[in-house]
């Protein structure tokens, strides 16, 4: 809408942009970027009511007491499990159906996969709904194989987020809720921004702005770390990171040294 010179406002009940994925420094940069593009941002302002005006437009009222007139309103809601058909207490349910690594629910013979279930978060060790297509596919194959009498295992997943807007890519890998020290790096003349949470020398979560070419290396590294199989970066991986002007300090944190 902003590209077409229309006034655009993004309102969110959350305190900042991408609340489940963006670290503080990354969120601040994204918000500055959006405002520079002409997007008005309102946070801590969830939609309370939407009314139609006599002229055909609409008025949105927000939970912070403010209101906004608009010609077009788009209401966006994230993933939510749809489980009203289950009798309360019949099966173990949190935000989703809780399953083990065979995708078995708490009732024998019942399996669940995809957005309706809570699988293992490899980093936290807790069950969590991880609404990703790749995870849903793996969970579905595991559940199907076990229903057919096999012994398949899905050890878990990792929280990830990839969003493209205007000419910017935002990528998050890892669980931002995990404790640690926040560190940041810039490269490519400021076009690349990296923010990471580090605990005991291990990266727990990474935010990238403008770094889609290096996201695969980072994702692979965090997956291996979560599974306890991480080793040093390969020469090819280090070469890719250096070609993309990734700071040496971050390469070292990832496990690249001596080359």
Describe each PLM feature range.
Residues 51-67:
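Conserved beta-strand-loop-beta-strand element in the redox core of flavoprotein oxidoreductases
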Residues 7, 40-41, 59, 92, ...:
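Conserved beta-strand segments of alpha/beta enzyme cores
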Residues 4-49, 154-162:
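Rossmann-like dinucleotide-binding cores of NAD(P)H-dependent redox enzymes
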Residues 116-214:
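Mid-to-C-terminal Rossmann-like scaffold of FAD/NAD(P)H-dependent oxidoreductases
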Residues 9-11, 42, 74, 111-113, ...:
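Hydrophobic/aromatic beta-strand patches that form the interior of the parallel beta-sheet core
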Residues 11, 52, 61, 99, ...:
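Hydrophobic alpha-helical segments, especially N-terminal targeting/anchoring helices
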Residues 67-142:
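FAD-site-proximal beta/loop scaffold in flavoenzymes
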Residues 187-257:
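C-terminal auxiliary extensions adjacent to catalytic cores
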